[in-house]
C-alpha cells in the first residue's frame, strides 16, 4: 500500500468543517443535534479521525435522522460510528484502495426501504490500519480480524463469530503466500479480502461480513466454486443451504462461466439463522441478461418470479437503460435463507452516469409506482438534505447504486450513496476489481 499512502499535511489538517451548514425548507439543519452533542467534547487519536468525523460522521448523522430512529437510538448509533467506524477509516483525505464502491473509499452508506415507512440505514466498511497493504497484512486479514474482535467485546446482540472463523479458514491463504500474492497474481493493487457491513435497525447493530474468492482460488489452484462448495458442505448441518447454493453455482457455471462468484456474504450471528448471499457480475447490460439472472437461466418459475420480472422491467424503463449502457458492471446477488431450496434475487442498477437530480426524480417515480407516495414526494428534498454541498444538477456520484429485491413479502429497494459530504466528487471506473 506504500504507493497509495496519503499524508495529511499541516496545510490540510484542521481545514475540514462539518459537511453542510445549510437548512432545508422543512427547517431541518444539516447538523443534527446528536452529532453536535457528541462532537462538543470529542477526543480523537489523530487529526485524520477528527476530519473523518467532521465529514462522514456529520453525513451519517443526517442519514440517521432520515431513518427516523428515536433520539436514544441515534446517540447509540453515532457513538458506535465514532468508536468503531471512524478509527478504521485510515488517512484523510482517504486512500483510494477499496473495491466496495466506485469512489474506491473504504466506506459505503445506504438506505434500505422496505415499504413507505422509515428506511434502514446501513454502512459497509473496509477497515484500514497502519499494516493494511504492507507485507505485515497484505490482504488486510489481520486488520479485519482486529475489528471483529472489537465488535465481539462490545457485546452486540446475537453477535457470533463462528462463520467468521470458518470462512476465514477456508478462504484465507497461509501468511507466506499472502505476502507474495500481489506479485504472484500480477494484480495492480492488493485489495482487501474481507470487509464488514452494519445494519442499524430496531436499536441494534446487525453485522455482516463479505469475502472475495479469487485470492483463495489463486493460492490453491482450485476453482472458486469448488472452494465455496467445500466450505458450505462443512457447515451445511447448520446453515441448511447447499441445495440452493448448488442451484446458483450450476447457473453461474453455465451462463456466467467467465466470471465465477467473485464474493459472498453472511451474517455474523448463529449459523443456523444466517443468510448467505452469492454475488455475480457481468459486463453485459441487457434486459435479456436480467431475465436470465432472475430465472436462473429458466429454472426459477412462478408468480413471484413473474411479478419480480414485471416490476424490474418497469424500473428498467424508468432508468432508461435501453438508451445507454452504465459504466459499472451489471451486478446481482442470490440471497439464501436457512433451509431455503431456491434463492431470492437482488438486482443492482448502476446510477452514477447521470445527474443526481435526474436520479432523484427517477427514484421518486419508482416509489410512486410502488404506492409509496409520501416517500416519493419527499425524496428529492431528502437527497438535498443529505448532500447540501452538491449542485445535484451537475454532480453524478451522490448516488452510486439502486438495488431491488421482490419477494412474496414485498418489494425492497436499497439506495447507495457517496460516503463523503465534503470530499471530491471524482471517481474512476475499474474493470479489474473482481
From Swiss-Prot:
It is an enzyme of class 2 (transferase). Pathway: Secondary metabolite biosynthesis; Alkaloid biosynthesis; Mycotoxin biosynthesis. Residues 1-35 are annotated as: Disordered. It comes from Penicillium thymicola. One of its GO terms (molecular function) is transferase activity, transferring alkyl or aryl (other than methyl) groups. InterPro entries: Aro_prenylTrfase (IPR033964), Aro_prenylTrfase_DMATS (IPR017795), DMATS-type_fun (IPR012148). L-tryptophan binds at residues 104-105, 108. This is Prenyltransferase penG. Keywords: Transferase. The keyword Cell wall biogenesis/degradation does not apply. Residues 1-14, 21-35 have a biased composition (Polar residues). Prenyltransferase; part of the gene cluster that mediates the biosynthesis of penigequinolones, potent insecticidal alkaloids that contain a highly modified 10-carbon prenyl group. The first stage is catalyzed by the nonribosomal peptide synthetase penN that condenses anthranilic acid and O-methyl-L-tyrosine to produce 4'-methoxycyclopeptin. 4'-methoxycyclopeptin is then converted to 4'-methoxydehydrocyclopeptin by the ketoglutarate-dependent dioxygenase penM through dehydrogenation to form a double bond between C-alpha and C-beta of the O-methyltyrosine side chain. GO terms for biological process: alkaloid metabolic process. It catalyses: yaequinolone E + dimethylallyl diphosphate + H2O = [(1'E)-3'-hydroxy-3',7'-dimethylocta-1',6'-dien-1'-yl]-quinolinone B + diphosphate. Its EC number is 2.5.1.-. It comes from the Eukaryota. Substrate binds at residues 122, 208, 275, 277, 279, 348. Belongs to the tryptophan dimethylallyltransferase family. Pfam families: Trp_DMAT. Coiled coil: none annotated.
